[in-house]
Regions:
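Active-site neighborhood of divalent metal-dependent phosphoester/pyrophosphate hydrolases
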Residues: 128
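Active-site-proximal helices and loops of the catalytic beta/alpha 8
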Residues: 7-9, 13-120, 134-137, 141-146
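Active-site mouth loops of central-metabolism enzymes
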Residues: 1-3
Length: 147
């Protein structure tokens, strides 16, 4: 754990990157996220005009996603619940903007106005939105993709 954290700190110090996008965060022990965040805040943040930003990617409930945010682990997570709402509206045509309003309000009530969540239209873990919108793929009656 310390070796990987050392490597991450080295990248932050020597490349001037602003942060990290972490994949599959739920498959890595919580202690790692706490370690890397604690060390970045102690060693890298003081020498910069801005804080290091870390966003994670995990699928799960609102409560599960929130468990990673601003508790010493990550600054943000991708908001897949909002992504699925957008897909229901624009691709599946099973929802409307009233549902989008409710999803945004729920997201704000759970994550808070002070957390910058990763609201996305696309993900490498899902079929790309444009594959549906430009007609390359259609959603079948049961919600599976077909060419």
């Amino acid at each position: 754990m310390d070796t990987v954290a050392d490597i991450a700190i080295n990248w932050l110090e020597n490349t001037n990157i602003d942060g990290f996008r972490h994949d599959a965060t739920k498959h890595i022990p919580d202690e790692f996220w706490k370690t890397i965040t604690r060390r970045a805040k102690a060693k890298v943040n003081p020498s910069r005009q801005q804080n290091i930003f870390q966003i994670g990617e995990s699928f799960g409930s609102y409560e599960f996603i929130k468990s990673y945010v601003n508790n010493g682990m990550l600054d943000s997570q991708f908001n897949f619940e909002l992504f699925f709402t957008l897909r229901r509206i624009f691709v599946e045509k099973e929802s409307d903007f009233a549902d989008l309003k409710m999803a945004l309000e729920k997201s704000l009530s759970i994550y808070g106005y002070n957390n910058l969540m990763g609201n996305i239209m696309d993900s490498h873990d899902q079929v790309r939105m444009m594959a549906y919108l430009d007609g390359d793929l259609d959603f079948s009656d049961n919600g599976t993709e077909r060419a």
